[in-house]
């Protein structure tokens, strides 16, 4: 299960070459993974020509990926700086957590009423992966599985709008954690994830909602005031621990337009 990439997303580009399409998908996936796993900091600058060179794609393809990332709130365009990894402000961070406090307690309440045994087992597998990552000191992997836990709850609720919303909120939460110097050791607590699933398993909707609210509050409380971020041109950070795979290994059975 450790080979599963919860951040791999399928996208389509107007490009005749399957190899080029696969490289574009790979570029998007690795940029998102690098942000989520805290490998790349808010303020990091993306230069079109550098990305094109790293991933062996055209600058047109790079622009499409950057435009999508901008729509998702993961990058921003700044005067004289160009495109950089977004750094949520204090108010934006507050908004992110307010939205999550409205959505996630409702999600776990719904799961208390209707959640299959398979979903419960899937949740526990994710928690196990997260715990093993913590024990091995693999901080980046622990962060990844922590985010996947929250997205998997939304997925189990079978509400497509919430699945999309939670995907965006968890990604933006990762940026907020970085921008606010939150420690990954005290943000998403593995034990709290287990307690939430136990409440769902026992169909205790009030306890599940209460535990989720407390969990989100603990994450927010782990943050300090936003710090000024410095931009960098070191895009090789994107590939730290994420070696470029062969484009032929990228799944392309179903694509989405940028």
Question: What is the meaning of each model-derived region?
Answer:
Residues 14, 18-22, 87, 94, ...:
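Charge-dense, low-complexity intrinsically disordered segments
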Residues 52-53, 87, 171, 184, ...:
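Short secondary-structure boundary/hinge segments and terminal tails
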Residues 92, 96, 100, 108, ...:
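Conserved amphipathic alpha-helical segments that form helical-bundle/coiled-coil interaction surfaces
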Residues 73-76, 169-171, 185-187:
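Mobile beta-alpha loop/short-helix "lid" or hinge segments that flank ligand
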Residues 2, 124-127, 131, 136, ...:
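C-terminal all-alpha effector/ligand-binding and dimerization domain
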């Amino acid at each position: 299960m450790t080979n599963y990439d919860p951040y791999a997303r399928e996208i389509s580009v107007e490009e005749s070459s399957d190899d080029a399409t696969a490289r574009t998908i790979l570029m998007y996936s690795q940029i998102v993974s690098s942000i989520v796993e805290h490998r790349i900091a808010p303020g990091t600058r993306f230069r079109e020509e550098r990305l094109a060179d790293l991933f062996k794609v055209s600058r047109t393809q790079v622009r499409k990926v950057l435009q999508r990332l901008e729509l998702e709130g993961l990058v921003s365009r700044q005067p004289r700086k160009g495109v950089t990894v977004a750094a949520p402000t204090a108010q934006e961070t507050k908004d992110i957590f307010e939205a999550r406090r409205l959505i996630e307690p409702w999600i776990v309440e719904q799961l208390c009423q209707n959640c299959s045994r398979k979903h419960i087992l899937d949740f526990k597998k994710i928690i196990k992966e997260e715990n093993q990552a913590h024990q091995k000191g693999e901080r980046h992997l622990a962060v990844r599985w922590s985010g996947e836990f929250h997205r998997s709850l939304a997925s189990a609720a079978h509400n497509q709008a919430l699945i999309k919303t939670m995907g965006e909120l968890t990604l933006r939460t990762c940026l907020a954690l970085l921008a606010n110097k939150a420690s990954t050791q005290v943000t998403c607590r593995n034990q709290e994830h287990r307690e939430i699933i136990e409440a769902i398993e026992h169909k205790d909707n009030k306890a599940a909602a209460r535990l989720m609210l407390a969990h989100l509050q603990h994450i927010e409380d782990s943050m300090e005031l936003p710090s000024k971020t410095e931009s960098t041109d070191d895009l090789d950070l994107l590939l730290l621990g994420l070696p470029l795979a062969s484009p032929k290994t990228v799944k392309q059975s179903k694509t989405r337009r940028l």
